[in-house]
Amino acid sequence: MCSSDLNYIYKILDGNQTLHPVLRTDVAPYYRKLNINLMNEAAETLLGENDFFSFCRFREKATTVRKLEKFDFHRNEDGVIVGEVSADAFCYSMVRGLVGAVVHVGEERFPVSWVREVLEKRERQSESLVFAAKGLTLVGVDYPEDAKLLERANLTMSRRSSTEED
């Protein structure tokens, strides 16, 4: 089956905060303090249908064009940064690559415009950080109605250009 949307959350505890033992397996610790406003500005520049080659691990015959529907961050009541990421499909390591790039902006290593520049270069960046799998959780899969499952599967698996419409 092929989904219509995949929904992930990514939890980060920044600034060397003390990690509660219960959260140990669910949250990625990060030693620097992050600016969520800058992270959200950078994330917003990636929304829509784009070729995310720069943020994906290469896989033979796989498309890297995806439609990123949601990518934003907030801090919860425990002080944990929660990133919400939704798309029609994800390439291998794409969520971890996107979060890593936005974290670089959040720590003010690069300007907000940098993530869009990385996207448009269509090449893996040595500066780009692929975040650890710890902290990443699949929270939902939304399927299209039965009549559209095959159409959705074919679109997701086909090679497509970033100018095609869904």
Language-model features: where?
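Structured-RNA-binding interfaces characteristic of tRNA pseudouridine synthases
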Residues: 1-166
